[in-house]
Amino acid sequence: MAQFNSTWAISGRRSAISVDTFHALSIQAPGLLLGTLLFYLFYKYTTRIYFHPLSGIPGPRLAAATHLYEAYYNILRQGLSKRAVQLHKAYNSPVIRLGTNRVHVGDPSYYHTIYNSGTDYHKDPGVYKLLGIDGSILTITDPEEHKQYRSIVGSLFSRKTADDLAPMMAALLNRSTESMARQGREGKPSVIQRIYRSVAADMVSYLLFNRPLGLIDSPQEADHYHSFMLSIDRFTAITWPRFYYPILNWVIDSFPAFVVERLQPGLRNLQELFKGWLDESIAAHDAGKPVESRSTYFDLMIEAKRKTGEPLRPDQLFDDILNYLVAGMEATSYVLSFGTYFLLNSPEAKAKLEAELLEASPFIREKFDHRRIMALPYLTAVVKECLRLSNTVPGFLPRVVPKGGVDIGGYHIPGGTQISMIHPVVELNEEIFPNPHEFIPERWLGDNGQDLEKWAIAFSKGRRQCIGKNLAYMMLYASIAVVFSRLEMELYETTAADMEIIDQFAPIIQGVVKVKITKDRWRE
């Protein structure tokens, strides 16, 4: 019995010790976990700042340590691109470090190395996949896959297609300027930016499907703000939050249909419209009907998928179409809005343009000939200056440094590093463009203009340049020619503050461009 009691006592003490130990550990566990986490973060950030291959490149230490630096500027401060320009000046360096594995180049001479044809600097897959537009031309990063994709849709974006669509462009411009002139007679201002968006969206729809969306003639166009545009504005407003926090894409995709319809009115209707057009194309192909006029986007995709045996994914096609619509509508209307603002603030340039357009009236008003319009020298200079100053690509277009790395400004940048160069580095460079912030179309005329051609980078350069370049040029020339030959106008409640550029991956402006029509020259 004594032995039993002794054993029990020892066992009890052990049990008490175990309980005490567990209790002590349970109290200390949060502290241990916190300490471990802090040590991990300290090690991680110290390594990134001081021992990373990019540690010798100037730049904010916070940017080197965490992506929160760029997230802050992109989400809350209208874009990291503006900050990049300031950082190059602050550090007096042609290269700055903007992220844990990311650098930005501020020397224009390297632009054609990074973005030229045949370059080994390819799109960074880690960036473009976060845009959430699966299978669109924007997010394809593999050069061979991109080449194959362009071979499928290339005919849609040819110069011949742009030529064929010119009469439709003229008709849309006639109807839209008539609407603006009517508003002028009623004493109402026109939100010309929205009108440009409607025209551009209808033209992109013509290009893709041989028929317009009908935005110009829509009943919703009383104030030229279609529900589709409202949806796009809301969608682009959360581009950066979705980019840095991809779980938001999952959350948005999980919303019930009625919530999506409330948040993005117009997009659901657009999906249904495109689904109907897709079903028509599939039925026509199944019945062996010949393609009328020219092949549409759906025709080309159906044929390509059936050749390879791949399934046709309507959701992927819709994402691709939406990318084309938004890019074509936003970029074109954005440049035209800037152009209108610049011209109405530059009486001398406006007078020169209007004089040239008056002489060209026979092939603008009477028998529209866009090829002759695009040959007008001063109009060409105006278009190029609008493209330069509007900064159509405010963001970074990230690429990956090839194996072996590259030396820039005395710094070695190893292969695998994300590298980029914002367009303002070139377009607002004082050595290339003296008085870079001033609207001076004359800089593009004569021999000087020829020398500047290599720096006309609004549509980027190389194999990944804008696929819609031909259509965009046609729309820009035609719009400025028709609007400024027909309408006398002045800015209405639009200031420089409204033209402040915000980088939402695609550029937008702070406000809207409004004009007041004072005369319709074609009704005199």
From Swiss-Prot:
Swiss-Prot/TrEMBL catalytic activity: cyclo(L-arginyl-tyrosyl) + reduced [NADPH--hemoprotein reductase] + O2 = cyclo(L-arginyl-L-dehydrotyrosyl) + oxidized [NADPH--hemoprotein reductase] + 2 H2O + H(+)
Binding site for heme: 466
Family matches, as InterPro entries: Cyt_P450, Cyt_P450_CS, Cyt_P450_E_grp-I, Cyt_P450_sf, Cytochrome_P450_monoxygenase
Membrane-spanning intervals of the chain: 22-42
This protein's record includes keyword Coiled coil: no
Positions of disulphide bridges: none
Membrane topology according to the record: Single-pass membrane protein
Protein function: Cytochrome P450 monooxygenase; part of the ank cluster that mediates the biosynthesis of NK13650 C, a highly modified cyclo-arginine-tyrosine dipeptide. AnkB is responsible for desaturation of the ankA product cyclo-Arg-Tyr diketopiperazine, likely through hydroxylation of the benzylic position followed by dehydration to yield a dehydro-cyclodipeptide. Within the pathway, the cyclodipeptide synthase ankA acts as the scaffold-generating enzyme and is responsible for formation of the cyclo-Arg-Tyr diketopiperazine (cRY) from L-Arg and L-Tyr.
The protein's name in its UniProt record: Cytochrome P450 monooxygenase ankB
Organism: Aspergillus thermomutatus
Upper classification of the organism: Eukaryota, Fungi, Dikarya, Ascomycota, Pezizomycotina
Gene it is expressed from: ankB
